[in-house]
A protein has these predicted regions:
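Transmembrane alpha-helices and immediately adjacent membrane-cytoplasm interface residues
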Residues: 73-80, 88-111
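Non-transmembrane, membrane-adjacent beta-strand/coil modules in membrane-associated proteins
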Residues: 125-195
């Protein structure tokens, strides 16, 4: 099956800069919120819904980065401790980077996919949260797909249907076929899609839970 890239209007330089600034700010704020939710054990799972994680392929990588960043911060602080004007900015920058990585990790932990009486919540960290009502779902199937790194998040197949790919390590393993083309909100804007491909750490459990409602 061939796919094509969805064309989007080009932004001006100022529009692109504004978009990046807004997105960075929102990621920062959501990162702090994720840390708060993790510390106080308040995951975002709708009442009555079952949670399904998707962080396992990335967990070891993120933990290594966080540990190395922590060690690096301490070592650099010791090396430049005699020069306050250098030490303080580097320490602030190091702490900010460490907090950012923690927010990224905790964003996945406290915002899992959810399957419940009212539908499916498809998540990708703190940036993507797509509610799909059961009335909009035609089918939920297990389907493993390995996706090229260069392939965009939204593609259009030969049959004219747009597919959203929320991959982890270039892989998805669940397909949600929608009853009709449905608008979904993404970080770069709204896209209209007919299918959603996502990754779950336990695709069998996700599929079995979805079968209870479809």
């Amino acid at each position: 099956m061939t796919t094509t890239t969805v064309a989007r209007p080009r932004r001006t330089w100022w529009q692109f800069a504004g978009y990046l600034a807004k997105r960075a700010t929102m990621m920062e704020l959501r990162g702090y919120q994720s840390i708060y939710r993790f510390v106080f054990r308040r995951p975002r799972v709708p009442a009555g819904a079952a949670a399904f994680s998707y962080h396992q392929p990335l967990l070891a990588i993120l933990i290594v980065i966080i540990v190395v960043s922590t060690i690096e911060m301490v070592v650099v602080d010791v090396i430049v401790s005699r020069w306050t004007y250098v030490r303080v900015p580097l320490l602030v920058l190091s702490i900010w980077g460490l907090v950012y990585m923690l927010g990224l990790l905790f964003g996945m932990l406290v915002r899992p996919h959810a399957v419940g009486p009212h539908g499916i919540r498809v998540r990708s960290g703190s940036e993507v949260d797509i509610p799909i009502d059961w009335g909009d779902v035609q089918s939920v199937t297990r389907r493993k797909k390995v996706i090229s790194e260069k392939q965009p998040k939204v593609t259009v197949d030969a049959d004219g249907q747009a597919t959203l790919h929320l991959r982890i390590m270039n892989e998805t393993n669940i397909e949600v076929q929608l009853e009709r083309a449905t608008p979904v909100r993404l970080p770069h804007g709204t896209e209209t899609v007919s299918r959603v491909h996502l990754y779950a750490d336990d695709p069998a459990a996700f599929h079995n839970e979805a079968r209870r409602y479809t």
